[in-house]
A protein has these predicted regions:
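Long, low-complexity, Lys/Arg-enriched
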Residues: 2-255
């Protein structure tokens, strides 16, 4: 700098100093925030299209509200061994998820039961739903939604941008229930009854359909409340039911 004074006027040096001090201050502030384990879950879409999740992009999504634990995060990568349309495929990836979940999440929880997870999933929908089942509501976790248009895991806003409502349709007497989650697209009842002999249909619909129907944590909370309310209603009205059909058209964060 001393040898090239004309290239570094006082204003530029002061701006460099300010940016450096701001960066140091931001890092120091993170010391006092809660740590979180980044959990990145991937499996080829439709069994053919590989996906990758950037650790840096995930870290940017959680900071500065949380501090990232470790330098690489936790990865659950489920490899495909069978044809996507075969029953062997789902049996294989389900076993793979069980095994990797035990090796990562369960192992961490055994050491630190109160640990917080930030979850970043890119995988076929049934596999993500199984991941949600495995984590349950006892594990402290926040799920993030990938935006393909912005190539980012950051929420688009902090405000609620969508609303969710439920509808019940009784087709005939009986206790065979289907739960239809119409968030990214509206699913017609005939598409359900063509493949599932349902007596009762429960729909949860987004006010605004589309891949961007969940744009914030507030949207996710609103959907979750309506989902819990419908599940409670099914349980209370049909207590003897042990199985229902689930038909999802929804983003990964809601799964």
């Amino acid at each position: 700098i001393d040898d090239f004074e004309d290239d570094y006027p006082e204003e530029s040096l002061l701006e460099m100093k300010r940016k450096h001090e701001d960066a140091i201050a931001a890092q120091c502030d993170l010391i006092y925030t809660e740590p979180t384990e980044l959990l990145m879950v991937t499996s080829p879409i439709k069994g053919r299209y590989p996906v990758k999740i950037s650790f840096k992009s995930c870290a940017n999504a959680v900071m500065p509200q949380k501090r990232v634990s470790g330098s690489n995060g936790q990865r659950i990568q489920i490899e495909v061994e069978d044809d996507y349309h075969s029953t062997h495929y789902w049996e294989s990836v389900s076993r793979g998820l069980e095994r990797r979940f035990f090796q990562t999440v369960t192992a961490i929880l055994e050491e630190s039961p109160n640990v917080h997870f930030s979850v970043f999933p890119l995988a076929p929908m049934p596999l993500i739903m199984k991941l949600g089942y495995k984590m349950g509501d006892k594990v402290r976790a926040e799920v993030f939604q990938y935006s393909r248009s912005r190539d980012s895991w950051n929420w688009n806003t902090h405000e609620q941008t969508n609303h969710f409502s439920a509808e019940k349709q009784i087709l005939r007497e009986g206790r065979r229930v289907a739960l239809v989650l119409s968030l990214t697209a509206d699913i017609a009842p005939t598409r359900i009854t063509e493949v599932y002999n349902a007596d009762i249909l429960y729909f949860i619909r987004a006010e605004h359909f589309g891949v961007d129907c969940i744009q914030s944590q507030a949207d996710l909370v609103a959907f979750w409340r309506e989902y819990q309310r419908v599940c409670d209603e099914i349980k209370n009205i049909y207590p003897q039911i042990r199985e229902i059909g689930v038909f999802p058209a929804m983003p990964v964060s809601a799964a």
